[in-house]
Amino acid sequence: MAKQIIVTDSTSDLSHEYLKQHNIHVIPLSLTIDGKSYTDQADISSSEYIDHIENDADVKTSQPPIGRFIETYEQLAQDDVEIISIHLSSGLSGTYNTAVQASHMVDGNITVIDSKSISFGLGYQIKQIVELVLLQSKKI
């Protein structure tokens, strides 16, 4: 069985330590706050983002460009892995649909999941996938 790698977006609110520990690849969303652009979780934290919302800033989010997904999927697929790509709800963003489109453009074993959730709900699902992957690896 191929090694399984998880890809998600920056809305899961999982700690950087957890993401690194479990080799989870994150494709960040873009944020615009009062006309200034940020990369989610790289240039601005969740708490800073929430502070801006609470202070009535003009806040907009933007899904990652398809090229970011293609680049990530191609890089990971070189190692002949199974990619599990789980993202925030398709009802809130086009991120899931972009991930699906990118998965069809890359020669690899890629499963894209619509979490139907965001933030802690998405993070919880990722943690469950991590547990299943760890359990599966112990059976081999």
Swiss-Prot record:
The keyword Lipid metabolism does not apply. InterPro entries: DegV, DegV_domain_contain. Hexadecanoate binds at T61, S93. Residues 4-140 form the DegV domain. Keywords: Lipid-binding, Plasmid. GO terms for molecular function: lipid binding. It holds the Pfam family DegV. Gene3D superfamilies: 3.40.50.10170. NCBIfam families: DegV (TIGR00762). May bind long-chain fatty acids, such as palmitate, and may play a role in lipid transport or fatty acid metabolism. PANTHER family: DEGV DOMAIN-CONTAINING PROTEIN DR_1986-RELATED (PTHR33434), DEGV DOMAIN-CONTAINING PROTEIN SPR1019 (PTHR33434:SF8). This is DegV domain-containing 15.5 kDa protein. It comes from Staphylococcus aureus.
